[in-house]
Amino acid sequence: MLEGSCHCGAVRLTLPFAPEVATSCNCSLCRRLGGTLAYYEFGTVKIEGHPESTAEYIWGDRTLRTIHCKTCACVTHWEPLDPAPGAKHGVNLANFEPSLLASVRVRRFDGADTWKFIDE
């Protein structure tokens, strides 16, 4: 089991498997949050403490909600506002043991300008 949590432990996440790749994005939100995200099919990540211990931030084109703990403010994940078949979760790997992130290939995504990966 790959288990992680926000700093205070109110929001707990369990991943269905270790990611092979994660993304570091430089869009106006991600660069401020500083997270590295791995993506999973919506509904496959076990999230405890959500929604009772979380708050959300919705901005831009209003298709995603960024979720953070109400108590410690750690961003745990994002999820689609209207999940369609094939929808994804973006899970912040900073909430897991550092060894998980160290084992994952991190790709750099230019969400600020080109909307393309910039590490190819």
What is the meaning of each model-derived region?
Residues 1-5, 10-120:
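A short Gly-Trp-Pro
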